[in-house]
Amino acid sequence: MKTWLKTVFGVTTLAALALVVICIVLRPSRVYKPEGNTKRALTLKDILNGTFSYKTYFPNWISEQEYLHQSEDDNIVFYNIETRESYIILSNSTMKSVNATDYGLSPDRQFVYLESDYSKLWRYSYTATYYIYDLQNGEFVRGYELPRPIQYLCWSPVGSKLAYVYQNNIYLKQRPGDPPFQITYTGRENRIFNGIPDWVYEEEMLATKYALWWSPDGKFLAYVEFNDSDIPIIAYSYYGDGQYPRTINIPYPKAGAKNPVVRVFIVDTTYPHHVGPMEVPVPEMIASSDYYFSWLTWVSSERVCLQWLKRVQNVSVLSICDFREDWHAWECPKNQEHVEESRTGWAGGFFVSTPAFSQDATSYYKIFSDKDGYKHIHYIKDTVENAIQITSGKWEAIYIFRVTQDSLFYSSNEFEGYPGRRNIYRISIGNSPPSKKCVTCHLRKERCQYYTASFSYKAKYYALVCYGPGLPISTLHDGRTDQEIQVLEENKELENSLRNIQLPKVEIKKLKDGGLTFWYKMILPPQFDRSKKYPLLIQVYGGPCSQSVKSVFAVNWITYLASKEGIVIALVDGRGTAFQGDKFLHAVYRKLGVYEVEDQLTAVRKFIEMGFIDEERIAIWGWSYGGYVSSLALASGTGLFKCGIAVAPVSSWEYYASIYSERFMGLPTKDDNLEHYKNSTVMARAEYFRNVDYLLIHGTADDNVHFQNSAQIAKALVNAQVDFQAMWYSDQNHGISSGRSQNHLYTHMTHFLKQCFSLSD
């Protein structure tokens, strides 16, 4: 770990420093004025109002050639690609009658659920009121109406059977008008969750609001029970408008704390009252110590695949289970367990990848690290040891979209060697050897270098959504020939709006330092002149498995800072970031807060060498993990930064969630990694903030990175008698996302930076 040296000033040095400070204060403000252009610069108001936001188009597939889409006037429209038929399946007046903001069509197309009264809970979860509309009769279903608010609701894959979660218990309806059947009875607020994840699983493992899955034929329903009874509670005040604040309590396991106890059950929904839920056994090698459930995939109507992780998270076990009619139980034989282990870090990327099963319901494709440490697609038929590697190279496969009888569609960053690009590829798996084709590499090449896709069930048709670097565009394609059929959304209105705007120039390049290569994105002011000197703002996230340097379009706060204020912005992907191989990724394993910071400092020095950066006007800012890195960079004692901002920063990994902290740091125990947990805190660097201007920001109702983190930083700075600025946002969560708070936040940060850089208002 880097040694943090304390600088001692003598009397002469102090006098010289005082003189420098006086000179800086007296220096006149600077105004950035792009010349020779009649276009206007972006304004902060443009950003806060979302004036230049873009649209995407994702079809809601209901068959191989049919999909639904919600129009701009909120009609739900049916489309048939082959017949070119389109019509309104549900009118906006019906939507408005219950103030619906979302919908879901039953697979038999007889009913639609309408979602209203959306109330956000955590990152993915929310509650809502649901109404069922009968399309054939043109009226809402009356009798045995759904309770409110519901935590999650979904249709079965066939017919119009539905399951929902209410007050942490799961209920089943065979038809929308039927009385509900209660499947679970153990649900209790903040203690036992059925069919929905608790806080830590939602945020750090599943990344969903649900934890239940229908079998393909709708016969079985699998669900997870999370028991949080023994988990410590995080409590914080929500001030509201009342005389007394109320207390929010969340079971929240921090590093080293007791974790949720998870059990997976499957219930036969055809006769749920005859045979209750059946528990699926945990693999022995996992059950012998603390473990996590990581995902569930239905393979066929009577075969299911479960994934488990050891608490240390370097060993993952994939277990394939079959329904035994004679036992009326689920059997998970040991010879159907596949183990994935990392010897250099943690298993998988941010999450362990999920399998994409073949038509035979036995073999599957999965992304994991090859012998060279790059994540690639492998074909597993019997054991992981005998896996056949499908892709290879010093790049990474990102995601498998679809596996059909003769094709596999996936995304990667292979093309032209840019880690921050995404293209869609097709592998013809019926051929020997398999042949590979890049579907998107040469489509609108200048405009589109970062794609995702949405496929119909058997990939007969698919939509491509390009996110940049030019204006986003969504297109429909034939899955057999890859030919473009139709442009779904091309953002023409946005294109016209931007014609009179001075946008900055964006460059994505790489810099080398010793044997390391760092990719960076630099946003340069309009009419950029290399012979001049510009202030520099580093925007950092830097967390493990993250990526900031991406070829995507954006008009946001940093775009404004470059366009209007003449600030050069740089984003750098240092060690620990994703999609450049395990050696680069796992460099930060068990030592967070070291290389992420060092690599930002290295990049700043390289940028100064380019000749157009004003060394006296360099700042850094970040949010969440980025707030942690920006804080440590400011306290590095290098003198590179004049000022910086940390929004909702982690300040100690002992304060953060067990699943996340332990994945990258191990356990905070003496016989594991307690020493680095203690050494890597922001508080340990409090003395080194003396010579920088530091703005610390946090929401008081942050359920993710608790306000405790910033409170401890502030306490350490006060104890060290270090001056700093702070801003808190009452009742705001991790995103500080309410309109007025967000406006205040970005206005305040802008004023801080302009003062730091001596820029005129």
Curated annotation (Swiss-Prot):
InterPro entries: AB_hydrolase_fold, Pept_S9_AS, Peptidase_S9_cat, Peptidase_S9B_N, Serine_Prot_S9B/DPPIV. Expressed strongly in uterus, pancreas, submaxillary gland and skin, less in lymph node, ovary, skeletal muscle, adrenal and bone marrow. Expressed in reactive stromal fibroblast in epithelial cancers. Expressed in melanocytes but not melanomas (at protein level). Detected in fibroblasts, in placenta, uterus, embryos from day 7-19 and in newborn mice (P1). GO terms for biological process: angiogenesis; cell adhesion; endothelial cell migration; melanocyte apoptotic process; melanocyte proliferation; negative regulation of cell proliferation involved in contact inhibition; negative regulation of extracellular matrix disassembly; negative regulation of extracellular matrix organization. Substrate binds at E203, E204. The active site is at S624 (charge relay system), D702 (charge relay system), H734 (charge relay system). Gelatinase activity is inhibited by serine-protease inhibitors, such as phenylmethylsulfonyl fluoride (PMSF), 4-(2-aminoethyl)-benzenesulfonyl fluoride hydrochloride (AEBSF), 4-amidino phenylsulfonyl fluoride (APSF) and diisopropyl fluorophosphate (DFP), N-ethylmaleimide (NEM) and phenylmethylsulfonyl fluoride (PMSF). Dipeptidyl peptidase activity is inhibited by 2,2'-azino-bis(3-ethylbenzthiazoline-6-sulfonic acid), diisopropylfluorophosphate (DFP). It catalyses: Hydrolysis of Pro-|-Xaa >> Ala-|-Xaa in oligopeptides; Release of an N-terminal dipeptide, Xaa-Yaa-|-Zaa-, from a polypeptide, preferentially when Yaa is Pro, provided Zaa is neither Pro nor hydroxyproline. Changing S624A: Localized at the cell surface, inhibits gelatinase and dipeptidyl peptidase activities and stimulates tumor suppression activity. Glycans are attached at N49, N92, N99, N227, N314, N679. The record marks C23, I24 as: Cleavage. Residues 26-761 are extracellular. The chain crosses the membrane at residues 5-25. Disruption phenotype: No visible phenotype. Mice are viable and fertile and display no overt developmental defects and no general change in cancer susceptibility. N-glycosylated. It is an enzyme of class 3 (hydrolase). It holds the Pfam family DPPIV_N. Homodimer; homodimerization is required for activity of both plasma membrane and soluble forms. The monomer is inactive. Heterodimer with DPP4. Interacts with PLAUR; the interaction occurs at the cell surface of invadopodia membranes. Interacts with ITGB1. Interacts with ITGA3. Associates with integrin alpha-3/beta-1; the association occurs in a collagen-dependent manner at the cell surface of invadopodia membranes. This is Prolyl endopeptidase FAP.
